[in-house]
Amino acid sequence: MSDGVALAATVSGERGQAAVILLHGGGQTRHSWQGTVKKLGTLGYHALAFDARGHGDSDWSAKPDYSYDRLAEDLETVASKMADAPVIIGASMGGMTAMHAIGRHPTTLARAMVLVDIAPRVDPKGLKRVNDFLNGYRDGFADLEEAADAVAAYNPHRPRPQNPRGLMKNLRLRDDGRLHWHWDPRFFRERSDEQRERSAKRLLDMCPDIAIPALLVFGAQSDVVSAEGIEELRARLPQLEVGTVPGAGHMIAGDRNDAFNGAITPFLERHAGLDGAQIA
């Protein structure tokens, strides 16, 4: 990136094929898209998912600068390396990043946009639950079982894995001998209600200039996206299509990856140029 930060990415497919960029949510990594990226590649898409700065295997910002404008600049840089304008799929924080970047380049950055369980204005109770989890456990975990218990408490509707070894993709062993989440703890800072309102208004004001196709996919059990938030976005983005994934909460791709893939299939067929491809 322009400030020297290196971003880790996973790619499937070949350059020159219909391009798709996938952005994970806050506290997640590119591995949250693992199944979708692999499937897209087998169907002839050039799919790329990368760890946001301060997450996963990507570098941490020295300053630190983790504003949405900074994340949007990173996305713009990645998109500029693709052979053609991509479809951008963003979950939660990734969706907010996509809206900021596309709002700055409403007709040239992306071919289409998919928002995953996010809108400019979200349910404050659901947002607090997410933030409490992301800002909790600052002292880390003694072992994988303790980390798995924390995740199970946050996602009670999802079965607790019998073997928690997969969590190691999201954990790092630090000098204190404890396991800590992979992200830079400076990334998640509490924002005031006034700051969140200014951010929501800024995004909503950008929306009328966005003319590309757009899809919002939300989890039927989500406590983050509300009916009011969806309708407010749709009023500013009239081309917005809306799809629901039954049995999924805020973390749709992790809760129901098969159903999520099915929800985006028709949209990608129409706007990424692969007639007849099915993601299942």
Residue ranges, per PLM feature:
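Conserved alpha/beta-hydrolase catalytic His-Asp/Glu region
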Residues: 142-198
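Conserved HGGG/HGGXW glycine-rich cap/lid loop of the alpha/beta-hydrolase fold
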Residues: 11-57
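Conserved serine/cysteine hydrolase catalytic core
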Residues: 175-236, 241-244
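Catalytic histidine-centered segment of alpha/beta-hydrolase-like enzymes
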Residues: 248-261
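Glycine-rich "HGGG/HGxG" loop immediately N-terminal to the catalytic nucleophile
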Residues: 31, 52-68, 124
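Conserved acidic catalytic loop of the alpha/beta-hydrolase fold
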Residues: 70-86
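Conserved hydrolase catalytic core segment
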Residues: 84-124
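A short loop-to-beta-strand scaffold at the N-terminal edge of the catalytic core in hydrolase folds
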Residues: 3-12
